[in-house]
Amino acid sequence: MTLLKDKVVLVNGGSQGVGAAIARAAVREGAKVAVTGRRPEVGEALVAELGEGALYVRADLSDAGQAKAAVGTVVDVYGRVDCLVNSAGLTSRGTLLDTTPELFDAHIAINLKGPFFAMQAAVADMVSRGEPGTVVNIITSSAHGGQPFLAPYVAAKAGLIGLTRNAAHAHRWDRVRINGLNIGWTATEGEDATQRAFHGAEDGWLAEASAKLPMGKLGQPDEIADFVVLLLSERSGVVTGSVIDWDQNVLGGLD
């Protein structure tokens, strides 16, 4: 498998969930992979699984300085960053009426500021070398509007859609392609914890939820990862500035 042969891929939020699946898929396609995360024991375990040449960088991506420094560490180790994936995210609940300034700021920091400054550093490296590069931002189908209890999350992720398109337009002449993926409801350990913590879900909730969906299942991290690898690779051609709904619901469709 060679879609990303010898490419240096940085996956922010790559130590677990969708990010970890993307890291595994990138390695399978021949990439040298670095992942960031806040929990060393999780990140180091994944890197051991990924094998020789993989790198874990401890970083709190809500801190702009750490987001930029993580890119710098990857450049120091590998000499460059060819591909960046922003997969870190915060999904804590809040409505328009009960969201505190602190919760709002936390969502903006993780879901928008972190990707902004990671892109700033990674794209600067790509441009300085005069080589093509790719960025994929993991966003959410909820950014189209979402549920009432996701107000700060939706605000931040909708901002990431705008940033994705703005940056893609700004750097298309540099041959840096920047795209986004609006993923739908996905079966991860984090989603299981969210359902239990915020919605009182019990054992068996996943099977019940899956049975009510058109495809009979929630989105799968490995499926998302394969799609991200395609977007990162030359196989996706010239596409840039696209924000793709990776979901089994159709925007505007009514039952």
List PLM regions with ranges.
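Conserved glycine-rich cofactor-binding loop
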Residues: 15-16, 39
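Substrate-binding pocket helix/loop in short-chain dehydrogenase/reductase
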Residues: 95-96, 103-108, 209
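Active-site helix of classical SDR
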Residues: 119, 156, 164
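Alpha-helical segment proximal to the catalytic Tyr-Lys
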Residues: 124, 169-173, 237
